[in-house]
Amino acid sequence: MNKNFGTKANGGFSFLMKMLILVVCAAFSTSAFYAPNGTKAFADGNEELRGVWISTVANIDYPSQQTTDSNVLKNDLINILDNCKDMGFNAVFFQVRPCGDALYKSSIFPWSKYLTGTQGLAPNDGFDPLQFAVEEAHARGMQLHAWINPYRITNTSADNPYLAKQNPAVLNPNLVIQDSNGKMYYNPGDQASIDLIVDGAAEIVQNYDVDGLHMDDYFYPDGGYNDDGTYAYYKDEYPDKAAWRRSNVDKLVKTMDERLHSIKANIQFGISPRGIWANKSDMAEGSDTNGGGSYTAIYADSRGWVKNGWIDYIMPQIYWNIGYKIADYSVLCDWWSDVVAGTGVRLYIGEAAYRTVSSTTEAWRGENGVNELRTHILNGRANPNISGYCCFTYNNFIKNNAIYALMKEVNSEAAEAPGGAILVNGDGQNDILRRNHPWRMFPRSFST
């Protein structure tokens, strides 16, 4: 293709091409936002992600009890989604694969024990929690993002003997590694593990009308595992074992990005990593912090994923208060804001709503915690590179009436969850139009 495509030599064609792409993107945007009765609920241009995680691991948020009773499971979801709507949230991140399992009908992973009490046991009446949650969220004008934990198989070693017979970890024990506590994980260095995880995510996007596929901050275990046998095959190519481990996680992220968008062009694929990528004292590009960074601790190069454009959004878990010496909230927000600038990758901030309930730190106690969370949200709205927030986790709003009321206050003016186009590198020569990757229909660069 002509490398000068879109330059002044082509007159107004570059502008017309951009308009054409915008029209195409708009055609793809119908699944990004849902309003009751088919009406558009929010004003054009008024976009902000107002998200909340709905955790199912250890039944943190859902279900209220492990049961096969479909009525109980339905009513729990209805109650949760009604409250989320009442608080002004416009997106929910529903954990559907907490531990190598499924809260949906899967041909790959077994039904979750957190749902029915026994891994592999289905709910009554053919009930499918994910399908029901998607329909109910959309009926309330909210996006539904399916949240998976990619590698984790068991949350405690006590669960190891109780895996379902059809669990891929049972059928393929060669793919499993264990950490120092005996918890089981799929080996990130094994290509078959990557294929399994990606196939599982693709199954969700293929079979359900989800708005996004979301992964959280668990990658390599923190320690105590042995992957020497796998590394031996790659040692010549990667003399540095840490670099090899990071390349394995990178491969998962890149493959996931490509596979999901090949199925559904406007799917939103994003990750919620640790709030710290790396400290400046360890990496020149790092933040002015002194906490545990994902780059070295769990081999997750979250900054690199943004720079490479492998994700549609990044949602760092900045779970500290403003002024916290080890990891200042404001410092990290500014650092991540600089990281995403000009990339077309959206930045959402992961907020520690749970600290207003469980923290003993003065900054989070009582009214201080309410004010802290309010300030975070308002400061984010003042930063043009921050496109919203997501709170961990739902049950804390039920435990703390003050932050329930806070959400109603700060979300009193409705906003649409993002899903529109972002034009970056708009120099007419290497334009990239990103609306959750519908620009994949076109080259990333118009150069050959």
Language-model regions, residue ranges each:
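Active-site-adjacent "subsite" loops/lids of carbohydrate-active enzymes
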Residues: 47, 53-75, 135, 146, ...
